[in-house]
Amino acid sequence: MVAAGGGGRAWTACGHGPARAVLALLTALLVGLLASACNNSPYPAGAERENTMFYSFDERSPRYLDPTASYANPESAYTFQIYEPPYGYHYLLRPYRLIPKSASEVVKPKYLDKNGQPLPDDAPAEAIAESVYDVPVTKGVMYQPHPAFAKDSQGRYRYLAMDRAALGDKRSPLAFEHQGTRELVAEDFVYALKRHATTRIEAPVYSVFAEYVLDLKDYAALVKTEDEKLLAKLPKDIQDKPFLDFRQWPLAGATVVDKYTWRIRLKGKYPQWSYWMAMPFLAPIPWEADAFYAQPGMAENGLSLNQWPVGTGPYMMVEFVRDRRHVMARNPNFRGEPYPCEGMPEDQAEGLLADCGKTMPFIDRLQVTIEKEEVPRKEKFKQGYYDVPEIERPEWGVKFRTDAENSDDVKRQYEARGFKFPLMTDISDWYLGFNMLDPVVGQGATPEQSAKHRKLRQAIAIAIDWEEGYGRIFRHKGGVAAHGPVPPGLFGSREGQPGFFNPVTHRLVDGKPVRRPIADAQALLVEAGYPGGRDAVSGKPLVLNYDFQRAITPEFKSENDWMAKQFAKLGIQLEIRATDFNQYQDKTLKGKHQIFWAGWLADYPDAENFLFLLYGPNSKSKASGENIANYQNPAYDALYRQLQSLEDGPAKQAVIDQMVAISQQDSPWAFGYFPWGGLAFQQWVTNGKPSILIRDMAKYYRLDPALRARKQAEWNAPIVWPMYMLGALLLAAVWAARRSYRARETATARRAVPAAGQV
């Protein structure tokens, strides 16, 4: 009995106890799984109900948000929301129309002859010695809150004379106790234009501005001399350089007329100047911000205009976590602007005029999160966690439309979820280029070398079958093969017109351009000194380096593999040197690239904006310009200078035709393709209209957070039946184990009790 009784109590403690513990553990596990399944949102609970737009950025944080230096599309997603150039573009009207932003009106230049006497508006370009723009500033415009403007009760700046200790570990302007503001004045625009003569940071459009802004070249030389004096006794690698105060030195080409008027003086006639005034390069910069960020420790703490811009626009940077997250919030000092009431005929039907006259911006916060690969970005959009995939990239609508075309199930899902993919025909291009400073593919040191290198470039240009690659294979990001540098839709472009083609890469067959056979490219390669892709003298294989501006993720690997196959047609080995965009920028600035991949989204609607990408003085490696190929041809450069003063008309067309022909023959680019464009929006995002030129789009967008919350819950409802089934199976296993264990214990107890009659 003792044994039996003892055995029974032991089973309760050592049998029921563990079973109950296991059961409790399994229950807790199931509850935890169910709870986690209820919400897979990447944001804190309740974020979907806030008036915040969520979207993503690629790979790395923007490198330059300083408006003097910033000239990359990923950076425009921030600069155009924060800064306000003098002009902008009407959001809805096409063709594009300039409208005033921080200026109170769009002004026409006054023309002067060499004696300073006024000329009529229709004066011939050769008679115009000077163009004068008197630009009125919108009154009452206030800067965002920032410690650079903060003053004490005596009117003294609180934070413009700090030492390293006073800064401490502050890494955000918002960490300072006091914030201030002030009104926008004409001096801020003059200061901004002067900054293009800086020696401290990259100034990519200095070479363009210096050709036209009166005395800007001499001013740059003066600034360089003065800066050398400031830095003379300091270590060369010092981060904390003393404040370079451009107010000290006057510039004849940019002056203050009065508090609310500034004057620009240009040499000759340059009609495109008004377009430059719609870009952040001429957005106002308060000297206080420049002085604030020049103080000791600021650079070390990541405090500069490149991370923390200071503007008058609808948004301001409130969070900058490098390579993770950026947040822009509504600028409390922004004056507000009315949503447009005028648009194209189709805009009314699309609902784009429903907010006519209402005050913008409509959205309180813009939260941008890093997403390194395309697949998770697309999935989060389909789940409703991104309102748009990326705000600045114009190809997402094409990608999603291609997915829908390839699958009826995908098409039904997209339609059921109300995704919107508006398409556009806009002005941009992608191209493969050659660094003309390179000893193998470049200009060459002698006429003989020049001829051979040109034939090598031409052979490669023939071999790359853009029609196949980006017309058929990569249709989700493709377009129409380019025959020259000027995209369709601009005056002067002949792309797509009957009889126009690139004679180097194509020939006419039945009146249509057809790519030349690979035999033509192979023959050119022989003349270039590389028969079969080998050096005719040494017999060594020709190996070329391809600098790609993105890290190789799965979606880019197939494209780069395809590109390598194009070179392999000629027996040329292509080494892929892929980097992130910031490293790519460094490499091209230093001239260390050989063959490269690049694209251009129009800054303004004029062929000149694409033809300047091959203008010699605009060299990337020599002048920090946007001529990444570092191409220089005296005939082309002379035509470009002539082009700059021409209005649309036969004379301008003739000049463009000559420039295109030169670029085709010299082949500094293998050209590429003009991409199809389209955006992607959730159903709760309204007022979305695709455009390459309009980058301050966020203020026009409107959200319906309540609808977003409902749809996110609907689209991400947890699928719990597999977990219930797993739980049932686990419970059944526990029950079976308990029953088996109990049976064994019972059998053991019976063997331990003596049989009847035994003592």
What name fits each language-model region?
Residues 23-35:
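Bacterial N-terminal signal peptides
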Residues 37-46, 91-92, 135, 139-202, ...:
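Extracytoplasmic/periplasmic ligand-capture domains
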Residues 127-129, 258, 322:
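Residue-level recognition of beta-strand termini and adjacent short loop/turns
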Residues 56-125, 310:
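N-terminal lobe/hinge region of extracytoplasmic solute-binding protein
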Residues 657, 661-693:
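Extracytoplasmic/lumenal ectodomains and periplasmic regions of secretory and membrane proteins
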